[in-house]
Design a protein with these regions (language model features):
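Peripheral, non-AAA+ core regions of ATP-driven protein-machinery
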Residues: 18-24, 35, 164, 239-242, ...
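Phosphate-binding/switch loop-helix module in NTP-utilizing enzymes
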Residues: 114-190
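Terminal-proximal interaction/regulatory segments of ATP-powered molecular machines
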Residues: 289-334
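Residue-level preference for the first positions of well-ordered beta-strands
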Residues: 53-55, 83, 140-144, 192
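A short alpha->loop->secondary-structure connector
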Residues: 101-108, 159-168, 210-215
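Phosphate-binding/switch region of NTP-binding enzymes
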Residues: 168-284
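Catalytic P-loop NTPase motifs of RecA-like helicase/translocase cores
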Residues: 93, 151-152, 202-203
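The Walker A/P-loop phosphate-binding site
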Residues: 2-107, 119, 124-128
Length: 334
């Protein structure tokens, strides 16, 4: 044991420790949706990892940007002194959009990036600046890359300017390199990161299969990969948001290939906090759904009424029971 301590002392730094001294407390970023928290962490009171990369992938118009902004809003609300660096590759995020989501404009930095190399450099510089600060001066920070699929490369731009009609074979290697450097740095700094990405249909697959663009770099780097698909949510004839099906394609914190449906509003409400809990309670036998109404405390109530007055039905005792069901349904080893 003295020999190991000597090794740690001689070759180590702040991040080299005996296994017994490692802080094993998993930190989470509440997403704003209890059921989505359960899907990605195994607990409705959890969320996305507080120091790892979470990938949110889906086809065009599945609400990836709105989904990311909803998580950012919740992160900033939960951390009044926190801030977010939002790497925007599509010029899709503007002042009015951010304000419409109820996000504090003073604590969100939008960084426009065009190439993978530019994103890599700026992200690494930001993490290094953060790590150089004394630990007690580090304010909670979050990164978002929206989206990986739209990043170009220096070679692709140079070839286009020189009218070279050749395919860029460097992109996937550059993506791998960028995330190789970022993954550990983000973990050391306790900075969570959300990366949105496009998906495409795999041609020739025996069963319909979706795959993320950009090669395998993000696939290996991400702690959690969520695939999104959606349908419109209407209030009368007006489309007010999306009902989004979220499925875990990869997860180190919860079971894979599980799916839930969450409701995402287009306005400042963002993710509906309680949507999906009725279905979770039904799975765990807390209540029954009879002809579209839920039997709760001897009363039959429509889901719309329950979700309109959630505090009346989802009491602290009920939430604890739902958390136990979520652990059974989504956690490894259950």
């Amino acid at each position: 044991m003295d020999f190991l301590k000597e090794i740690v002392k001689e070759i180590g730094d702040d991040y080299t420790k005996l296994a017994r001294d490692i802080d094993d407390t998993e930190k989470y970023v509440d997403t704003g949706s209890y059921i989505f928290n359960g899907l990605v962490s195994g607990s409705i009171f959890g969320g996305v990892s507080g120091n790892k990369i979470t990938a949110i992938a889906g086809e065009s118009s599945t609400g990836k940007t709105f989904f990311s902004l909803a998580v950012v809003k919740n992160f900033l609300d939960a951390n009044p002194d926190g801030y977010c660096l939002y790497f925007d590759t599509e010029a899709a995020v503007n002042k009015s959009l951010i304000a419409s989501r109820g996000i504090d404009l003073e604590r969100l930095v939008v960084v426009n990036v065009v190439t993978i190399e530019e994103f890599r450099t700026k992200a690494l510089k930001a993490v290094d600046i953060y790590l150089k600060k004394p630990e007690d001066e580090r304010r909670p920070c979050m990164f978002v890359l929206d989206s990986l699929g739209m990043l170009s490369t220096e070679k692709e731009i140079t070839d286009a300017l020189n009218d070279k009609q050749v395919r860029d074979m460097t992109k996937s290697q550059l993506v791998k390199g960028a995330f190789r450097m970022l993954t550990l740095k983000l973990g050391q700094a306790n900075i969570p990161m959300i990366v949105t990405n496009h998906t495409y249909d795999v041609i020739g697959a025996y069963v319909p299969t979706k795959e993320m663009g950009g090669g395998s770099g993000l696939k290996y780097a991400a702690s959690t990969i969520i695939y999104l698909s959606k349908k419109k949510e209407k209030d009368g004839t007006t489309v007010v948001g999306n009902l989004i099906k979220a499925k875990t394609a990869k997860s180190r914190l919860s079971k894979e290939n599980k799916d839930v449906t969450v409701r995402l509003y287009y306005d400042e409400r963002g993710l509906d906090r309680y949507y999906g809990l009725l279905e979770l309670g039904e799975i765990g036998g807390l209540w029954k759904n009879v002809a579209g109404r839920y039997e709760i405390d001897g009363k039959k109530v429509y889901a719309k009424q329950i979700l309109k007055e959630p505090d009346s039905y989802f009491t602290p005792e009920v939430m604890e029971k739902l958390d136990e069901i979520a652990k059974e349904e989504f956690s490894y080893g259950s």
